[in-house]
C-alpha cells in the first residue's frame, strides 16, 4: 500500500438473525452516548469499510483472498518467534502503540474512573500496609495484586496517564527489589510443602507489558534469573497445585516471550518441562477439570505448545476443547458456556452462567490464538464475547460487577442460589466489594482488546482482524512508520473508515478480516468498487502490485 486512496469494504447481511450485537436492557444509563438498540437479536444489514491511503495510483492495488497471512517471511520490525518455535501468524504491537478512540476510549475512561481505576481505595488486597507484594508485610501475597495490575497497568500505558503509570511502577519496583539470590521473586507461598507459582505467573505478564512500554532491561534480568530457578526446581515440586497446574500455559507463554528476546537455550528446556507438568488439556472427550476460568484460560495450552512441538495434534486439541465444552454447555448466545463455578451435567440451559473472570480470560485466549494461528475464527469469537457477554457482567459506569452472569439472567440479588448456581454465595448481585478474583481480574478485558485492534503481519504489513475505533503507529516494510486511523462506531454502526498516513511512499500488505456473517462483501478504493469476490471467514490482502 502507498499513501491517499479511499477503500470501501461492503458487507451486506445474511438472511438470518444473529446475536453478535445482543444488548442487555438493564439500565437507562448510556455512558457511551450511543443510540440504544431495540431488539435483542438484530438482522445484519451492511458493514462498510472506507480506507484512505495517501497515493494517486489506484490501479496498482491488488487484492487477494487468503485463509491466513503469509508466513514465508519473517517480520523485520517487531520481535517474533525464533526457531525452533513455529512462526507467528500475527505480531502484537507494543502496548501504547495503539490509541483508543470513540467508544473504546470512552470505555477506558470509564474503567479509569470506575472499579478498576479506584480499586486500591476499597480492596483489602491492595492495601499497601503489610502487603507481601510491596515487601511491607506478609498479607495479600497471592493472585489479587497481579490480577489487578494486568488491567490497571496496561490501561495506564495505553492512556499514557502519568499518575497511573507511577502507581503501577510502585508495585513493580517492589517486585524488582524482591528477587532473591536464587532467582525467585515475589511473596513465597507454599502449598503442601511446594512453592505455589500461580501468582508469579500473572506478575510475569505485568512485567512483560512494562518492558514493552518502558524498555526497562531489569525485566529481562529478573525473568532470566527466575526461569533459571524454575528449571532447577525438582519436577515433583513444580506446578503441582490445582491452579498453577491447570494454568501452566500462562507460564509457557512467558517463557516463549523471553526466549524470543534473549535466545537462551535453557528456556526451551524449561518450556518442555512446563508442558510436561501442566494439566492435560489434550484429552478427546473429557477435561482435566470443569472450572469455567480454567477452561477459558487453559484450553489454549496445547496450541501454545504446538509452537514448539509442531505436532498438529496439539493444535487440534485446543479446537477440540473449545467445541467440546460448548457442545455440552454452550448452546447459548454470547460465545460462552454454563459453568458457574464449574460445569455440571444436568445444568446445561441458559440459566447457567460464567464468571466475569471467565469472560476476560476467554477474550485473552481468543486474542492469543489469533496471533498463534491466524485463524479469523478467534477474532470473531472474541468480538462475540466482548460485545455480548463481558459488558453484561458490569454496570454501565464500570463501577460494579457481578461474579456470575447468565444469558438468561432474570434477577440480580444477593441471595444464595445454590444448587441452581454451582457456587454458594450472593453471586448474582452487582457489588464492587465482592467477587474477589473477578473484582481484581476484570480490568484486563478492554485494554487487551484494544491492544489487538491492529497487528503486524509476518510479511511486514498490517492486519486488522477485530474492528474498533483507534489510531496506531506501525512499522512496515523496511522499518518505515505509518499511522493507521480507524474511524468507526462498530459494532453500533456498520461502517469502518481507515486512513493511512505516511511521510514517504511505502509498499506493504494490509489484511482485513471478512466476517462470516456477511453476504456479497465488496471493497471500494476512492469511490471505485474493486471487481473481486470476497469470501467469508477469510482475509482480504490488499497490496501494491
Positions of predicted regions on the chain:
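Bacterial Sec-dependent N-terminal signal peptides
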Residues: 1-60
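Glycan-recognition and catalytic cores of secretory/periplasmic carbohydrate-active enzymes
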Residues: 59-545
Amino acid at each position: 500500500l502507498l499513501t491517499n486512496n479511499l477503500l470501501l469494504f461492503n458487507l451486506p447481511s445474511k438472511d438470518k438473525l444473529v446475536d453478535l450485537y445482543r444488548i442487555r436492557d438493564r439500565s437507562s444509563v448510556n455512558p457511551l452516548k450511543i443510540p440504544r438498540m431495540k431488539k435483542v437479536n438484530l438482522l445484519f444489514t451492511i458493514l462498510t469499510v472506507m480506507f484512505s491511503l495517501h497515493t494517486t495510483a489506484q490501479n496498482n492495488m491488488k487484492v487477494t483472498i487468503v485463509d491466513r497471512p503469509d508466513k514465508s517471511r519473517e517480520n523485520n520490525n517487531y520481535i517474533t518467534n525464533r526457531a525452533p518455535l513455529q512462526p507467528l501468524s500475527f505480531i502484537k504491537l507494543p502496548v501504547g502503540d495503539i490509541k483508543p478512540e470513540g467508544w473504546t476510549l470512552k470505555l477506558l475512561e470509564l474503567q479509569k474512573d470506575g472499579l478498576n481505576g479506584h480499586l486500591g481505595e476499597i480492596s483489602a488486597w491492595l492495601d499497601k500496609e503489610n502487603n507481601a507484594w510491596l515487601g511491607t508485610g506478609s498479607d495479600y501475597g497471592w493472585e489479587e495484586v497481579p490480577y489487578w495490575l494486568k488491567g490497571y497497568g496496561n490501561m495506564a500505558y495505553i492512556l499514557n496517564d502519568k499518575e497511573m503509570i507511577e502507581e503501577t511502577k510502585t508495585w513493580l519496583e517492589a517486585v524488582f527489589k524482591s528477587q532473591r539470590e536464587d532467582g525467585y521473586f515475589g511473596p513465597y507461598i507454599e502449598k503442601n510443602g511446594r512453592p505455589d507459582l500461580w501468582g508469579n505467573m500473572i506478575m510475569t505478564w505485568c512485567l512483560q507489558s512494562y518492558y514493552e512500554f518502558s524498555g526497562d532491561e531489569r525485566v529481562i534480568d529478573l525473568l532470566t534469573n527466575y526461569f533459571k530457578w524454575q528449571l532447577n526446581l525438582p519436577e515433583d515440586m513444580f506446578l503441582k497445585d490445582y491452579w498453577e497446574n491447570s494454568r501452566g500455559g500462562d507460564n509457557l507463554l512467558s517463557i516463549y516471550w523471553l526466549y524470543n528476546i534473549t535466545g537462551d537455550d535453557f528456556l526451551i528446556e524449561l518450556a518442555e518441562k512446563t508442558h510436561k507438568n501442566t494439566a492435560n488439556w489434550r484429552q478427546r472427550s473429557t477435561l482435566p477439570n470443569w472450572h469455567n476460568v480454567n477452561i477459558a484460560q487453559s484450553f489454549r495450552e496445547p496450541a501454545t505448545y504446538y509452537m514448539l512441538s509442531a505436532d498438529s495434534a496439539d493444535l487440534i486439541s485446543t479446537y477440540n476443547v473449545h467445541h467440546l465444552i460448548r457442545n455440552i454447555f454452550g448452546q447459548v448466545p454470547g460465545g460462552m458456556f454454563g459453568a458457574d463455578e464449574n460445569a455440571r451435567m444436568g445444568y446445561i440451559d441458559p440459566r447457567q452462567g460464567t464468571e466475569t473472570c471467565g469472560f476476560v480470560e476467554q477474550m485473552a485466549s481468543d486474542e492469543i490464538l489469533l496471533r498463534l494461528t491466524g485463524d479469523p475464527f478467534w477474532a470473531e469469537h472474541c468480538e462475540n464475547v466482548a460485545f455480548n457477554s463481558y459488558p453484561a457482567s458490569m454496570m454501565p459506569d464500570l463501577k460494579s460487577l457481578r461474579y456470575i452472569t447468565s444469558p438468561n439472567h432474570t434477577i440480580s440479588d444477593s441471595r444464595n442460589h445454590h444448587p441452581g448456581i454451582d457456587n454458594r454465595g450472593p453471586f448474582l448481585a452487582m457489588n464492587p466489594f465482592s467477587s474477589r478474583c473477578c473484582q481484581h481480574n476484570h480490568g484486563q478485558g478492554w485494554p487487551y482488546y484494544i491492544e489487538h485492534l491492529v497487528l503486524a503481519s509476518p510479511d511486514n504489513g498490517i492486519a486488522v482482524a477485530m474492528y474498533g475505533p483507534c489510531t496506531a503507529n506501525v512499522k512496515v516494510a523496511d522499518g518505515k512508520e505509518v499511522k493507521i486511523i480507524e474511524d468507526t462506531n462498530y459494532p453500533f454502526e456498520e461502517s469502518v473508515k481507515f486512513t493511512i498516513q505516511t511521510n514517504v511512499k511505502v509498499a506493504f500488505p494490509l489484511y482485513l478480516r471478512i466476517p462470516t456473517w456477511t453476504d456479497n462483501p465488496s471493497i471500494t478504493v476512492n469511490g471505485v468498487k474493486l471487481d473481486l469476490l470476497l469470501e467469508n471467514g477469510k482475509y482480504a490482502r490488499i497490496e501494491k502490485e
